């Protein structure tokens, strides 16, 4: 397979990034490919980059790795864009849950299906989604866009309506 560039937006999440890098390292057809880690939080980005680089070295994967806090730089020449970004972070979710609890909302047994999520979280996620898609259309219009960031269904519906 030809070498490809994979841009990971929101790469500061160790859970998502490490799982993804594990799969990339163990896929021989991606040998020689570039993985571009992008996150606005430099401290988290540096930590994830260091862990992923170490894993790639230990598995002898022939991946090229780079890191940046500049989304447009990460998107340059990308063949695949993976969005794992959560704008408000876990603390934002906690704040949203606390507001819901304060006003008597029940969460139906799952914090992933929250009554207040549409108001508290999705506004920020939609804004990030829209700006990311617009950058992709400008910078790497032929790239495949994979959304792993929640709310996946709501973002997919917005994709169908607006793009």
Feature roles, as predicted:
Residues 2-97, 110-163:
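Metallocofactor- and cofactor-centric catalytic cores in central/energy metabolism, strongly enriched
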Residues 16, 102-103:
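Short, glycine-/small- and polar/acidic-enriched structural segments
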């Amino acid at each position: 397979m030809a070498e490809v560039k994979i841009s990971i937006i929101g790469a500061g999440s160790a859970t998502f990034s490490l799982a993804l890098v594990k799969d990339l390292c163990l896929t021989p057809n991606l040998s020689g490919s570039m993985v571009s880690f992008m996150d606005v939080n430099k401290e988290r980005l540096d930590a994830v980059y260091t862990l992923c680089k170490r894993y790639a070295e230990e598995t002898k994967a022939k991946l090229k790795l780079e890191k940046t806090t500049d989304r447009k730089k990460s998107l340059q020449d990308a063949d695949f864009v993976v969005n794992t970004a959560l704008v408000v972070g876990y603390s934002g979710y906690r704040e949203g849950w606390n507001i819901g609890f304060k006003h008597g909302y029940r969460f139906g047994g799952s914090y992933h299906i929250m009554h207040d999520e549409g108001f508290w979280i999705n506004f920020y996620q939609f804004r990030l989604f829209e700006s990311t898609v617009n950058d992709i259309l400008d910078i790497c219009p032929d790239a495949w866009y994979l959304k792993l960031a929640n709310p996946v269904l709501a973002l997919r519906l917005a994709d169908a309506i607006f793009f």
